[in-house]
């Protein structure tokens, strides 16, 4: 977070007692309760889910507004800045572990589960099974008939390649914006930040079109065996992270337009940039392991 440099900045700012954590927890409770009930066929679950989501977002808006006000009023000194940096570092580390688990699941299914199911001792149980990846493709059934409908895989051309170019370009525009901010060129910073936000938005539209194509034209669904589940699990969670990152960059851009951040103090900008570059790296892994291999 940024802060104004003045003589009143405390060594370590201790905020006043806040109701925001408890209110946010209540919103998450409604959201998770509703999601669980909706999945299990309870009609009221969707109302609880959306009510909890709206509640949680409103609390986050108020919470972030308070934090921004404290920052811009000069309450955040070096210790607070350092704590934010370590917090963001550990948050991104947790995200590395999050995606690492999913990449490991993909590797395990391909390298261990399929060969084990295709071994000789299972030949009597599943005589038609073929240890190939993906487990079921059009014209080549590799699982017991009727369990999984045949489907086609999503190759790297052209939608995933277009999205790769979009994300890599957004990383470049974000870096240019960062350098401009470090040199005090606010106008250039804002221009390239808007370019980054737009590139992220276009990425999401392309991925939405990709999903429609995969589901409708390729018959690739969540129920399409382990290939379908890992495909949507990895690309879906990554798309969600792109959406969150895009919102972060949008809020940072709006704050820049309001005059927030200086070339000396702008960790709010840097934290969002770290997150966006992390999203870029994860996509490169997806592009190679999911679409190419």
Predicted regions and their residues:
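...captures the hydrophobic TM-helix bundle architecture rather than a specific catalytic motif
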Residues: 1-293
């Amino acid at each position: 977070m940024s802060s104004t440099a003045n003589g009143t900045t405390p060594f370590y700012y201790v905020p006043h007692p806040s109701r925001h954590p408890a209110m946010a927890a209540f919103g998450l409770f409604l959201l998770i309760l509703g999601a669980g009930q909706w999945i299990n066929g309870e009609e009221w679950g969707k109302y609880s889910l959306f009510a909890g989501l709206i509640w949680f977002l409103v609390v986050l808006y108020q919470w972030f507004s308070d934090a921004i006000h404290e920052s811009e009023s000069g309450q955040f000194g070096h210790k607070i800045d350092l704590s934010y940096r370590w917090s963001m570092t550990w948050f991104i580390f947790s995200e590395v572990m999050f995606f690492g688990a999913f990449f490991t699941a993909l590797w395990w299914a391909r390298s261990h589960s399929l060969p084990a199911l295709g071994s000789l001792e299972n030949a009597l149980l599943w005589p038609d099974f073929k240890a190939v990846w993906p487990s079921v493709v059009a014209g080549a059934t590799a699982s017991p008939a009727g369990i999984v409908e045949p489907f086609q895989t999503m190759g790297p051309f052209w939608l995933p390649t277009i999205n790769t170019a979009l994300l890599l370009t957004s990383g470049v525009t974000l870096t240019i914006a960062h350098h401009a901010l470090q040199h005090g060129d606010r106008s250039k910073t804002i221009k390239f930040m808007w370019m980054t936000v737009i590139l992220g938005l276009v990425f999401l539209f392309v991925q939405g079109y990709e999903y429609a194509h995969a589901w409708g034209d390729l018959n690739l669904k969540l129920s399409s065996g382990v290939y379908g589940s890992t495909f949507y699990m990895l690309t879906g969670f990554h798309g969600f992270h792109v959406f969150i990152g895009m919102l972060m960059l949008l809020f940072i851009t709006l704050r820049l337009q309001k005059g927030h951040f200086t070339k000396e103090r702008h960790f709010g900008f840097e934290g969002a940039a770290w997150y966006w570059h992390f999203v870029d790296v994860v996509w490169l892994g997806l592009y190679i392991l999911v679409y190419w291999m």
